[in-house]
Curated annotation (Swiss-Prot):
<keyword id="KW-0223">Dioxygenase</keyword>
<dbReference type="GO" id="GO:0019442">
    <property type="term" value="P:L-tryptophan catabolic process to acetyl-CoA"/>
</dbReference>
<protein>
    <recommendedName>
        <fullName>Tryptophan 2,3-dioxygenase</fullName>
        <ecNumber>1.13.11.11</ecNumber>
    </recommendedName>
</protein>
<dbReference type="GO" id="GO:0019441">
    <property type="term" value="P:L-tryptophan catabolic process to kynurenine"/>
</dbReference>
<comment type="similarity">
    <text>Belongs to the tryptophan 2,3-dioxygenase family.</text>
</comment>
<dbReference type="InterPro" id="IPR037217">
    <property type="entry name" value="Trp/Indoleamine_2_3_dOase-like"/>
</dbReference>
<dbReference type="InterPro" id="IPR017485">
    <property type="entry name" value="Trp_2-3-dOase_bac"/>
</dbReference>
<keyword id="KW-0479">Metal-binding</keyword>
<keyword id="KW-0560">Oxidoreductase</keyword>
<comment type="subunit">
    <text>Homotetramer.</text>
</comment>
<comment type="function">
    <text>Heme-dependent dioxygenase that catalyzes the oxidative cleavage of the L-tryptophan (L-Trp) pyrrole ring and converts L-tryptophan to N-formyl-L-kynurenine. Catalyzes the oxidative cleavage of the indole moiety.</text>
</comment>
<keyword id="KW-0408">Iron</keyword>
<dbReference type="GO" id="GO:0020037">
    <property type="term" value="F:heme binding"/>
</dbReference>
<dbReference type="InterPro" id="IPR004981">
    <property type="entry name" value="Trp_2_3_dOase"/>
</dbReference>
<keyword id="KW-0349">Heme</keyword>
<feature type="binding site">
    <location>
        <position position="260"/>
    </location>
    <ligand>
        <name>substrate</name>
    </ligand>
</feature>
<feature type="binding site">
    <location>
        <begin position="57"/>
        <end position="61"/>
    </location>
    <ligand>
        <name>substrate</name>
    </ligand>
</feature>
Length: 288
């Protein structure tokens, strides 16, 4: 026990001062580690190379997948709330998704401590595995409206994952539901847009911009839709920053070498920067 006179408050016993009455016996109770299943989580890192730096590479990607799991949890629920017209909860969930993207943006700085020399040591052990094959990331893209049936192919060897992604492909996106909600409130969205195949993905449609323009020109009248539009812009803004930081991190580590999954690496990632999730919301800013 530390003899320092400042180590305990007046009137406390030595035991109380040291442990602050914290529970210490978990023989018949659930502990922190039990609740979080830390035995499983912390036993899921299996480096294939002898290199010290591979642990960083694994944990960077595993933690990203955990954040994406939470993102999907929020996006699925937000989509259902938008579908039912309950925008209050949806706005909170979308704000949380934006903050998750911010968290992932900052996380790239940790991976960026890996040098090209260090990465080249572990690269031969990675085979063809690549973040391009992340099924959670693919579902996030599908929920946000960036859909392409070709991207189901990397998951054909996992029947349960393929089925889940096929369902996500054919389910209306979050943005589809926002557009339907505008139409339900009497805003001028074309029937062609409302009847469009959900698997086709988002593309610009003039009537949707016209509807959003009415929302922005009368925010007091359409306050909930106005707030929804701004939350969608926040989300895509954060998503774009995450993508840009991804490109920069990959370029500083591997340069312009091909990616492990067979893509052009940085060239492929740069092409993804041109993807626009909610095109009408961006274009109307030039036309207000």
């Amino acid at each position: 026990m530390c003899p320092c006179p400042h180590s305990q408050a007046q009137g406390e016993t030595d035991g109380e001062a040291e442990w602050h009455n914290a529970a210490l016996d978990f023989t018949h109770a659930m502990s922190y580690g039990d609740y979080l299943k830390l035995d499983k989580v912390l036993d899921a890192q299996f480096p294939l190379s002898p290199d010290h730096n591979e642990m960083l590479f694994i944990i960077q990607h595993q933690t990203s997948e955990l954040w994406m799991k939470l993102m999907l949890h929020e996006l699925r629920a937000a989509r259902e709330h938008v579908k039912s017209g309950k925008l209050g909860p949806a706005l909170k969930m979308l704000a949380r998704v934006s903050r998750i993207f911010d968290q992932l943006v900052h996380a790239w700085a940790v991976l960026a401590t890996m040098t090209p020399t260090e990465y080249n040591t572990i690269r031969p052990y990675l085979g063809q595995s690549s973040g391009f094959q992340s099924y959670q990331y693919r579902e996030i893209e599908f929920i946000l409206g960036n859909k392409n049936a070709t991207l189901l192919k990397p998951h054909a060897h996992r029947a349960e994952l393929l089925a889940a992604l096929e369902q996500a492909l054919h389910t209306p996106s979050l943005y589809d539901e926002a557009i339907r909600l505008m139409a339900a409130q009497g805003l001028p969205v074309s029937q062609e847009r409302l009847a469009r195949d959900a698997a086709a993905g988002t593309c610009y449609e003039a009537s949707v911009e016209a509807a959003w323009r009415q929302v922005y020109q009368a925010p007091e009248r359409y306050w909930d839709l106005y707030q929804l539009a701004e939350k969608l812009i926040d989300l895509e803004d954060s998503f774009r920053q995450w993508r840009f930081r991804h490109v920069t991190t990959v370029e500083r580590i591997i340069g312009f070498k091909p990616g492990t999954g067979g893509t052009e690496g940085v060239g492929y990632l740069r092409s993804m920067l041109d993807t626009i999730l909610f095109p009408e919301l961006w274009r109307l800013r030039s036309n207000l």
